[in-house]
From Swiss-Prot:
Name the UniProt record assigns to this protein: 4-hydroxy-tetrahydrodipicolinate reductase
InterPro entries linked: DapB_C, DapB_N, DapB_N_CS, DHDPR_bac, NAD(P)-bd_dom_sf
Positions with a binding annotation for NADP(+): R39
GO BP annotations listed: diaminopimelate biosynthetic process; lysine biosynthetic process via diaminopimelate
Species of provenance: Sinorhizobium medicae (strain WSM419)
Top EC class, one word: oxidoreductase
Reaction catalyzed: (S)-2,3,4,5-tetrahydrodipicolinate + NAD(+) + H2O = (2S,4S)-4-hydroxy-2,3,4,5-tetrahydrodipicolinate + NADH + H(+); (S)-2,3,4,5-tetrahydrodipicolinate + NADP(+) + H2O = (2S,4S)-4-hydroxy-2,3,4,5-tetrahydrodipicolinate + NADPH + H(+)
Keyword Oxidoreductase assigned: yes
Annotated catalytic residues: H160, K164
Length: 272
């Protein structure tokens, strides 16, 4: 541990992603766990964060005081829920630190509050923090641009574990936005998220979504571009949720040297 290590806070520390983030921070050179935050009343308050995450004692007790933690830290890693994330965004702005947001399912109002916080914080937000998925987004945009809507239909399929609460996934929407950029259209005006009963023929230029939930699947995503007599499929499989945590820590380190603003993983990876 060095005095120059970036001091990071993990919020939602007792959750699956929270524990994974703690483990990755513990093993990554150049960063250290400054604080671990849980909601008030959590049975995990006071527990050592390292023991909770299975890496042994780290000397950091789980707390329910985020602002106290933020003002002494340099960054926060946030894979919580939209209602919590907008509150953490406000606190990160007050503390003027890096806020890495992997939370999905945010509403338009939530997004507006997070973007407003970026006037003072360095916000890095993505529906997926992995290198592979962000590269998939770039490839999807290029394919959508090369293959015209007249004759080529885009469908995005995703599957996650039974506990995921939002649909389509943030990654599916990230891929949908990439496809829409490639086509020069707005996703909101062309997405089809529900098909049931007599739907009629497919509308040219639509971007369809199909969602599956079950088991312990970490994340499966495919972009299908179907033409007459041929089909292009671009896909990504996540087999270990640590890929998201590693991406988040890399994003925090990158954000440390940036000016306040709103960034994505494409900025972090130099793919934008």
């Amino acid at each position: 541990m060095s005095e120059t290590d970036m001091r990071l806070v993990v919020v939602g520390a007792a959750g699956r992603m929270g524990q994974t983030l703690i483990r990755i921070v513990h093993e990554t050179p150049g960063v250290r766990l400054h604080a671990a935050i849980e909601r008030s009343g959590s049975p995990f308050l006071g527990r050592d964060a390292g023991e909770l995450a299975g890496v042994g004692q780290m000397g950091v007790a789980v707390s329910d005081k985020p602002l106290e933690a933020f003002v002494e830290a340099e960054g926060v890693l946030d894979f919580t829920a939209p209602s919590a994330t907008v509150e953490f965004a406000d606190l990160a702005a007050q503390a003027r630190i890096v806020h890495v947001v992997g939370t999905t399912g945010c509403s338009a109002d939530d997004e507006a509050r997070i973007r407003a916080a970026a006037r003072h914080a360095r916000v890095i937000k993505s529906g997926n923090m992995s290198l592979g998925v962000n590269l998939l987004g770039v490839l999807t945009e290029k394919a959508a641009r090369a293959l015209p809507a007249q004759g080529w239909d885009i469908e995005i399929l995703e599957m996650h574990h039974r506990h995921k609460v939002d649909a389509p996934s943030g990654t599916a929407l990230l891929l949908g936005e990439a496809a829409a950029r490639g086509r020069g259209i707005k996703l909101a005006d062309h997405s089809v998220r529900v098909r049931d009963g007599h739907t009629g023929a497919r509308v040219e230029g639509a971007i369809g979504f199909a969602t599956l939930r079950g088991g312990s699947v970490i994340g499966e995503h495919s972009v299908v571009i179907a033409g007459e007599g041929e089909m292009v499929t671009l896909s990504h499989s996540a087999t270990d949720r640590s890929i998201f945590a590693r991406g988040a820590v890399s994003a925090a380190i990158w954000g440390r040297s940036q000016k306040p603003g709103f960034y994505s993983m494409l900025d972090v990876l130099g793919l934008d």
